[in-house]
């Protein structure tokens, strides 16, 4: 490929602390009425002084450890100065000169195999407020409203090196990061609610000439799919400009979900534009070795470690293990099921197909469903005893999922118990053979597909309730024994 994208990400993770970064206002503000979770500190009233949230610092250290970062025992807060309607203080408290962590990495499944994406820095900062645009899209809004509730909500910003080589890799990185912060319990990672936000910097290299375009920042990507789509669009836009012999402007662009394009928002700021200087009202953060060891002990088994254990303990393929461990709750559900039904691969197949389909259709997590390990124990027992076929099991599963009823109850209510009476099935097959000697002759002359006729006959006569495995066995025995 002649043109190659070079992508770096700046990710904001909203921390699930009880209170905001520097005041006692609640941090969970998503569903609150506008401007109801504010105080003099988070709205920048004169004389109000910030007090750092210790839980915020602990969450940042946990995340840094999970991302293989170097933790700095000494870090400091700084003021990032800029004007925007949703920033009442006129500056944002962040960490610029001395971040809490640097030099980490996250391994992802890249386009050409396993790939380490380096993390340049991880630092703490407070969130700004939120602009609500009144109109059908950001470009056609007639006016905007400001909600200050989000001001002061604690964030960690994670900045990667430009190691990402495609829009798909950017999406994969984001998905894996969300999985990690959820495992840690430091964030919900919900992009639609703004708990995980991604800005991407993209430039394009012409591999034939070595020429590289200006860097463009892309914002407003509030789903993993939009991260990929926005970067695909921007890559194509930059390539077209380069093919015309032009260069794109160094600017910030926003993804417009309605038009499926990026639109210019403003010129790209340089770091000097923010006039960073040390925050005079907050002392430095000093971490002891004992504190770091204490936090390290709190780390749970993370997705990669859990996937390796699933492969080792349950003899699962790598793909299955990664899908099952992508969500902490799904992994826990799988292990609870294995305790009840010790058939890991069969359970994995059901969870990865039937369960995930039902969850995705409803856009819910496994913890929000009525499904329990006992449902699988009951379902597998019905199949093992020959009472239902796998086809019937899959047909009743949506109802099991929706209602929480036991499979055996649904089977009984609907009269779905399959017929496993060997004598009855044998009589039906013999009857079919007597009535259709040509199909018998076809089978004997090598046309094995002719057996399907007899299967169909038995299923029609039993209204689909005949045990298919037993039926096939009897058909084969009678046809080959003639």
UniProtKB/Swiss-Prot annotation:
InterPro entries for this protein: Asn/Gln-tRNA_amidoTrfase_suB/E (IPR017959), Asn/Gln-tRNA_Trfase_suB/E_cat (IPR006075), Asn/Gln_amidotransferase (IPR018027), Asn/Gln_tRNA_amidoTrase-B-like (IPR003789), GatB (IPR004413), GatB_C_1 (IPR042114), GatB_Yqey_C_2 (IPR023168), Gln-tRNA_amidoTrfase_suB_CS (IPR017958)
GO biological process: glutaminyl-tRNAGln biosynthesis via transamidation; translation
A single MF term (Gene Ontology): glutaminyl-tRNA synthase (glutamine-hydrolyzing) activity
Keywords of this entry: ATP-binding, Ligase, Nucleotide-binding, Protein biosynthesis
Catalysed transformations (reactions): L-glutamyl-tRNA(Gln) + L-glutamine + ATP + H2O = L-glutaminyl-tRNA(Gln) + L-glutamate + ADP + phosphate + H(+); L-aspartyl-tRNA(Asn) + L-glutamine + ATP + H2O = L-asparaginyl-tRNA(Asn) + L-glutamate + ADP + phosphate + 2 H(+)
E.C. no: 6.3.5.-
A Pfam family of this chain: GatB_N
Function: Allows the formation of correctly charged Asn-tRNA(Asn) or Gln-tRNA(Gln) through the transamidation of misacylated Asp-tRNA(Asn) or Glu-tRNA(Gln) in organisms which lack either or both of asparaginyl-tRNA or glutaminyl-tRNA synthetases. The reaction takes place in the presence of glutamine and ATP through an activated phospho-Asp-tRNA(Asn) or phospho-Glu-tRNA(Gln).
Family membership: Belongs to the GatB/GatE family. GatB subfamily.
PANTHER family listed in its UniProt record: GLUTAMYL-TRNA GLN AMIDOTRANSFERASE SUBUNIT B MITOCHONDRIAL AND PROKARYOTIC PET112-RELATED, GLUTAMYL-TRNA(GLN) AMIDOTRANSFERASE SUBUNIT B, MITOCHONDRIAL
Subunit structure as annotated in this protein's UniProt entry: Heterotrimer of A, B and C subunits.
Name this polypeptide is given: Aspartyl/glutamyl-tRNA(Asn/Gln) amidotransferase subunit B
Upper lineage: Bacteria, Thermotogati, Thermotogota, Thermotogae, Thermotogales
Gene name linked to the record: gatB
């Amino acid at each position: 490929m002649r043109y190659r994208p070079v992508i770096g990400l700046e990710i904001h993770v909203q921390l699930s602390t009880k209170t905001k970064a520097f005041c006692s206002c609640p941090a969970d503000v998503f569903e609150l009425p506008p401007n109801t979770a504010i105080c003099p500190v988070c709205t920048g009233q004169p004389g109000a002084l910030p007090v750092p949230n210790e839980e915020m610092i602990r969450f940042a250290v946990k995340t840094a450890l999970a991302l293989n970062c170097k933790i700095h025992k000494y870090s400091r807060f700084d003021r990032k100065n800029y004007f925007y309607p949703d920033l009442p203080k006129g500056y944002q408290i962040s960490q610029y000169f001395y971040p809490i962590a640097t030099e980490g990495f996250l391994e992802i499944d890249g386009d050409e195999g396993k790939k380490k994406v380096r993390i340049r820095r991880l630092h703490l900062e407070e969130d700004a407020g939120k602009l609500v645009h009144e109109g059908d899209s950001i470009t056609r809004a007639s006016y905007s409203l400001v909600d200050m509730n989000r001001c002061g909500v604690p964030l960690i910003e994670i900045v990667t090196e430009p190691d990402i080589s495609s829009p798909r890799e950017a999406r994969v990185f984001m998905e894996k990061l969300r999985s990690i912060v959820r495992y840690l319990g430091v964030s919900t990672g919900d992009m639609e609610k703004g708990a995980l936000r991604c800005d991407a910097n993209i430039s394009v290299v012409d591999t034939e000439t070595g020429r590289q375009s200006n860097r463009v920042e892309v914002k407003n990507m509030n789903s993993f799919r939009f991260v990929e789509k926005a970067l695909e669009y921007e890559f194509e836009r930059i390539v077209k400009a380069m093919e015309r012999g032009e260069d794109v402007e160094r600017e910030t662009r926003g993804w417009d979900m309605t038009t499926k394009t990026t639109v210019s928002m403003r010129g790209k700021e340089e770091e000097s534009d923010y006039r960073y200087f040390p925050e005079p009202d907050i002392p430095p953060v000093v971490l002891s070795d004992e504190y770091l060891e204490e936090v390290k002990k709190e780390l749970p088994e993370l997705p990669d470690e859990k996937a390796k254990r699933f492969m080792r303990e349950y003899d699962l393929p790598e793909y299955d293990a990664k899908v099952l461990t992508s969500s902490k709750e799904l992994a826990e559900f799988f292990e609870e099921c294995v305790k009840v039904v010790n058939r890991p691969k069969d359970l994995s197949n059901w969870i990865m197909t039937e369960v995930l389909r039902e969850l995705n259709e409803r856009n819910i997590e496994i913890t929000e469903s009525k499904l329990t390990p006992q449902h699988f124990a009951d379902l597998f027992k019905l199949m093992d005893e020959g009472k239902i076929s796998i086809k019937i099991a899959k047909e009743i599963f949506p109802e099991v999922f929706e209602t929480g009823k036991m499979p055996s109850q649904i089977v009984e209510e609907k009269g779905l118990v399959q017929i496993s009476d060997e004598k009855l099935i044998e009589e039906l097959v013999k009857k079919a053979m007597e009535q259709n000697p040509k199909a018998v002759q076809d089978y004997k002359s090598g046309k094995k597909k002719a057996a399907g006729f007899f299967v169909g006959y038995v299923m029609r006569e039993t209204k689909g309730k005949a045990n298919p495995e037993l039926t096939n066995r009897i058909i084969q025995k009678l046809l080959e024994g003639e």
